Amino acid sequence: DLTNQSVVQVNRLRTTVALSKGKSSAIRFVHKATGKPLFLVYNRLFNRLPTIAQKPDNVIQFASEDRFYIFDAKYRIQFDREYMAQYGGPGPTTEDVNTMHRYRDAIAIPHPMRPQEYLQGVVVGAVVLFPYPHEDMYRSHRFHKSIGQVEIGGLPFLPGATALVAEKIESLLASEFSDLPSSTQ
C-alpha cells in the first residue's frame, strides 16, 4: 500500500510527475502482510559519509534505513568491437559498472549508537540502467550474469524493454518477504 509520496502532484484537474534534477523525491509503501516499509527514492543523497557524498539516481530501500539496492540510469551504451567480444554484446559502459562498485563500497550510514562509526555493506547491489531494446539477447551478456554472481551489473531499460528490470525488482521483493507464502507477496 502507498502511504506517502512526493513524486506525483495533483493541482486542480492536472496530474504531474515531479522528478526534478538535483532534488530528491520519494514514495513510501507498506507491505500489507508484514507492515514492513519499502521506499523508492529518486536522487537520494548519501552525504553523511566519511569521504565523498554519493547520489545515485534511483534507490529501492527495503524495510529499514540500512538496506539499499541501487538502480542508476546512465544513458550510455558501449558497442565497440573489443567490448562486444569481451562482454558478449552491447551493454553498459565499463565506467558505469565501476560506478556501481563505487556506490556499493562508498555508501555507509552513521552507526545509531556510536557517532564516529559507520555501518558498511548497506548497499546489497547496484545496477546500471542503460538504453538497449534487445533484452533476450542481453541475458547472455557478462554484466547481466554478474548481477546473479555479485549483485553488480547492468540492465536494459527503455519503453517496451522493461522485463529484466521488472524481474529483478520481483526477485528483490521475493527475497525481502521470503518468510511469507507466495500468494501474499
Across the structure, where does each feature detected by a protein language model lie?
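Catalytic core segments in nucleotide and nucleic-acid processing enzymes
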Residues: 2-185
